[in-house]
């Protein structure tokens, strides 16, 4: 086993064991996720160099892997709001964060526009938005059959709607962390450019 370069607590495994037979993840001792998801620690280092976040919203949080990492990085006393719009997925999110065991977490089941009363409330908003899933091709044949150029456009439209709904909830000088699990420019580089142009954001870093 070896360390994930961008995450001090992440480990690569040489082979995939049967996690369901290991009591440790069921007790919240560790969480299994793709190494790519662990970019969060790199993002947090950039943020914490400017200020220490007190309130972070993980907007599309289920099943909870990124939320566990955000919560591990945040200081004690900071609040993580882990949200999932889909009810069944929100229940899974709540279960995983309950296992993780940190008290300063609130799990919500709301659509982005339902946060309209939280104007300027959050120091950081993490948006791992629903996408066309091109990053899933290597392990999910269904993702390949579901993909189409039209679906890419549909996903980009949905992402923009989500961003417009949630943008007012970010305080002045706060950070929006935008991520997808897809590769096309429309949902990534072009979306980030649109966020900057139409919402007035500034790119903090272009490091990859």
Predicted region positions:
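S-adenosylmethionine
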Residues: 1-207
């Amino acid at each position: 086993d070896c360390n994930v370069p961008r995450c001090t607590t992440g480990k690569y495994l040489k082979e995939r064991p049967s996690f369901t037979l290991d009591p440790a993840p069921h007790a919240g001792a560790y969480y299994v996720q793709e190494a790519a998801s662990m970019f969060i620690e790199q993002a947090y280092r950039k943020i914490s160099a400017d200020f220490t976040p007190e309130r972070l919203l993980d907007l599309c949080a289920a099943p909870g892997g990124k939320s566990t990492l955000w919560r591990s990085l945040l200081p004690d006393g900071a609040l993580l709001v882990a949200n999932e719009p889909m009810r069944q997925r929100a229940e899974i999110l709540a279960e995983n964060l309950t296992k993780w065991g940190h008290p300063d977490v609130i799990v919500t089941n709301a659509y982005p526009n339902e946060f309209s009363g939280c104007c300027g409330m959050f120091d950081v908003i993490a948006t791992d938005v629903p996408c066309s899933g091109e990053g899933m091709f290597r392990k999910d044949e269904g993702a390949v059959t579901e993909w189409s150029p039209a679906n890419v456009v549909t996903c980009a439209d949905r992402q923009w709607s989500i961003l417009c709904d949630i943008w007012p909830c970010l305080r002045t000088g706060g950070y929006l962390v935008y991520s997808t699990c897809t590769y096309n420019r429309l949902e990534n580089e072009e979306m980030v450019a649109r966020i900057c142009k139409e919402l007035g954001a500034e790119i903090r870093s272009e490091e990859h």
